[in-house]
Amino acid sequence: MVRQARETGPREEPHSPGVTWHESGLRRSRRWSRLRTRGATVWLTGLPSSGKSTVASALEAMLVEDGIPAYFLDGDNLRHGLSGDLAFSTADRTENIRRVAHVARLMADSGMVAIASLVSPAHHDRALARELHEAARLQFLEVYVDTPLEVCEARDPKGLYARARAGKLLDFTGVSAPYEAPEQPDVLVHGATEEPLVSARKIRVALEDAWVS
């Protein structure tokens, strides 16, 4: 699921003027070996209220209980800080994904499993997140939480679908903004019919398979 590439991070990307990439004196393989860990990013995508966060939380707990360092990057929480200056325009969504993808890549490089849960509705944005990891030779699993729109609307714990239908919330994915479903996700889970723990176990198996491939 990753192309053969260098261990270190990308250096071809846009960066601040006069700044060069600083190579660590500690190779990733050495860090992982000494810490007895392996890094990766699990990226959950799906409609709002599809069950992404519930599955992500279950996966995080499962991995940590098994002694695997993992951290859940919740899309809503990240907009309280890292992306607190962004709204929901197409450009802002793209920038949000870019920021989170870079954070996840750094976490994966350190030997953690970053579990990112974001609507991330556009193919090209998710492709960017994957490419960042593949360029750094890090595992990236795209998980599509496939839940019918009507089920998501029926859940609507924050009342966002109702507000969007009433025209009070613009650029809302699934109502006034499109969602581009993954065509070939690494893992497909069914948010309306699967228990979160079942979905989490499915992702865990795929992650183990990716590490040994």
Give each language-model segment a name:
Residues 1-41:
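Extreme N-terminal, non-catalytic leader segments
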Residues 44:
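Hydrophobic anchor at the beta1->P-loop junction of P-loop NTPases
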Residues 48:
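The conserved Walker
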Residues 52:
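Conserved lysine of the Walker
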Residues 57-105, 109:
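Conserved substrate/cofactor phosphate-moiety recognition/catalytic segment
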Residues 72, 140-142, 186-188:
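Conserved beta-strand scaffold positions in the cores of enzyme catalytic domains, especially
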Residues 81-88, 92, 104-165, 171:
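ATP-dependent NMP and nucleoside kinases share a basic, alpha-helical "lid"
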Residues 146-149, 154-213:
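Small-molecule kinase domains that catalyze NTP-dependent phosphoryl transfer to phosphate-bearing small molecules
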